Amino acid sequence: VRLLAVDNFATIGKLLSQEDCVSKILPIVASFSQDKSWRVRYMVALQLYEVCECVSADVVKEEMLPAYVRLLRDIEAEVRIASAGKVSKFCQLVGADASVSSILPCIKDLASDSSQHVRAALANVIMGLAPVLGKTLTIEQLLPLFLALLKDEFPDVRLNIISKLDQVNQVIGIDLLSQ
């Protein structure tokens, strides 16, 4: 039942007022992000961004950012894959400061995750962080991760990075990227 309930949180949240969503939906989602069943946590990871769209960025930072960080650090690879796939969207929602302080340490861990599928999921979306972080933070924080992922032993990881290079190019420029 919990598994099926998670699938409807975003839909219900969009029908409620923001205050009702904060008081009724977010506490349940936060609780389910710690559920003993990895499948429930997986569904929360898939739906969390859509639920967060129903409330303000400040509420997301206060209420849901800790839940998202927990999902990024989950013991199950499937949960990490699902949450890593939403990292760019979530960072756009919370902004550069919260992304650097809370999410970027998780991204650094995921870039060297033992699961190649987690690294591939991250590589598919990590380039989308460049516009959120801006030129300086992209150069300082993300460029080393891009380079590490470009050297990954798993070809899907490298392919995902290469296919998204245009997003970084728009932020830091071709000259720096080609170095």
Please state what every model-predicted region is:
Residues 39, 74-82, 86, 116:
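A generic structural signal for ordered secondary structure
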Residues 12-19, 50-58, 90-97, 128-136, ...:
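Residue-level signature of the C-terminal ends
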Residues 19-33, 58-72, 97-111, 136-150, ...:
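HEAT/HEAT-like alpha-solenoid repeats
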Residues 1, 36-37, 75-76, 114-115, ...:
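Short inter-helical turns and helix N-cap capping residues of alpha-solenoid HEAT/ARM repeat scaffolds
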Residues 1-4, 16:
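A generic tandem-repeat structural signature
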Residues 7-11, 27, 46-50, 66, ...:
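Residue-level signature of alpha-solenoid helical repeat scaffolds
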